[in-house]
Curated annotation (Swiss-Prot):
Subunit-level organization: Heterodimer of an alpha and a beta chain.
Name this protein carries in UniProt: Integration host factor subunit alpha
Protein's organism: Shewanella sediminis (strain HAW-EB3)
Region of interest (Disordered), ranges: 49-71
Similarity comment: Belongs to the bacterial histone-like protein family.
GO biological process, one term: DNA recombination
Any Gene Ontology CC annotation: cytosol
Record keywords, A-Z: DNA recombination, DNA-binding, Transcription, Transcription regulation, Translation regulation
Function: This protein is one of the two subunits of integration host factor, a specific DNA-binding protein that functions in genetic recombination as well as in transcriptional and translational control.
GO molecular function: DNA binding; structural constituent of chromatin
């Protein structure tokens, strides 16, 4: 099961007692800030969680799986996420308990 933005907003509503509309706006604003930073080429560092980085990938050869035809895969910029040590540790601990 995946955690959704709606579930995050609901959790804020329940734990902080703020109104649902405000909770939804907080979640949307959080993600919009991350989007804007990445769009402007900035790294996003969330202490205790991880880093969102931009990585440039060079053009490379590819192949159409249906036809076998060689096609170039164009150069592009991708977003990568590197989890922080605290997040890694918590995930490992949670998996060890299962």
């Amino acid at each position: 099961m995946a955690l959704t933005k709606a579930e995050m907003a609901e959790h804020l509503f329940e734990t902080l007692g703020i109104n649902k509309r405000v909770a939804k706006e907080m979640v949307e604003t959080f993600f919009e800030e991350i989007r804007q930073a990445l769009e402007s080429g900035e790294q996003v560092k969330l202490s205790g969680f991880g880093n969102f980085d931009l990585r440039d990938k060079n053009q490379r050869p590819g192949r159409n799986p249906k036809t076998g035809e060689d096609i170039p895969i164009s150069a592009r910029r991708v977003v990568t996420f590197r989890p922080g040590q605290k997040l890694k540790s918590r995930v490992e601990e949670a998996n060890a308990k299962k």
